[in-house]
UniProtKB/Swiss-Prot annotation:
Membrane topology listed for this record: Peripheral membrane protein
Protein's cellular compartments: Cell membrane
Chain sites annotated for binding ATP: 33-40
Entry similarity comment: Belongs to the ABC transporter superfamily.
First-listed, main subcellular location of the protein, grouped into a coarse class: membrane
Name the UniProt record assigns to this protein: Manganese transport system ATP-binding protein MntB
Organism from which the protein derives: Listeria monocytogenes serovar 1/2a (strain ATCC BAA-679 / EGD-e)
Length: 240
């Protein structure tokens, strides 16, 4: 996946400034940086969910939007209307819709895919619950299950571990590593850099501009972290 000269602005204020990099296929890549660095903006800009001032994102010489059916997106929980009357099962079943098109309805095959995904995240016992009744960790598992049901090749996750329990975080991380081991490409916006070395193969260190990008052991150094975070107090955690 190639990002070339990506610039994004809100109300004429630059949020992402001329970012160019390549994201390796079959890797777990983390987007890391201080608050306000543009991490979520970069993720959404890559997917074409928000307007770009300039730049392009391509995969195999085609715009990334061309591969939309092969891309799964897990948004921040705050972006989801938890009052919407949908059950856990139906939420996960939505993951099968991109492959169905506009007319075809989900059948036995799709329902089994949803059940299999719920089993992987250990949420089958909650399938009839309304999503607003779930805890943060349970809800995040459901979002992951929806992505699994899609059978995507590329997974974008925006702060999937924020405000969830450790059991859910460990389960989700195991699933992401399993997907990576099966050749999937995974990009995660992440805020807890104490776990960066344990979670990711590569990182994108960002503060509106690209600070560094590459394998964790080469990129996640004290010097580069301090450059990205500036005067903000940062406890160096590479290798933890």
């Amino acid at each position: 996946m190639e990002i070339q000269g990506l610039t994004i602005a809100y109300k004429q204020k630059v949020a992402i400034d001329n970012v160019t990099l390549q994201i390796a296929s079959g890797k777990l890549t983390g987007i890391v940086g201080p608050n306000g660095a543009g991490k979520s903006t970069l993720l959404k800009g890559m997917m074409g969910l928000i307007p770009r001032e300039q730049g392009q994102v391509t995969l195999a010489d085609k715009p990334l939007t061309y591969w939309r059916k092969k891309i799964a997106y897990v948004p921040q929980r705050s972006e989801v209307d938890l009052t919407f009357p949908i059950t856990v099962f139906d939420m996960v079943l939505l993951g099968t819709y991109p492959a169905l098109g506009l007319i075809k309805r989900p059948g036995k095959k799709e329902k089994q895919l949803a059940l299999d995904a719920l089993e992987q995240v250990e949420m089958t016992g909650f399938m009839k619950r309304q999503i607003g009744e779930l805890s943060g960790g349970q809800l995040q598992r459901v979002f992951i299950a929806r992505a699994l049901a899609q059978h995507a090749e590329i997974f974008f996750l925006d702060e999937p571990f924020a405000g969830i329990d450790m059991t859910s975080e460990a389960l989700i991380m195991r699933l992401l590593k399993k997907l990576r081991d099966n050749g999937k490409t995974i990009v995660v916006v992440h805020h807890d850099f104490h776990k960066v070395a344990a979670y990711f193969d590569d990182i994108i260190l960002l503060n509106k501009k690209l600070v560094a990008h590459g394998p964790v052991e080469q990129t996640f150094t004290e010097e580069k972290i301090q450059f990205a975070y500036g005067d903000a107090p940062v406890a160096f955690a590479a290798g933890v």
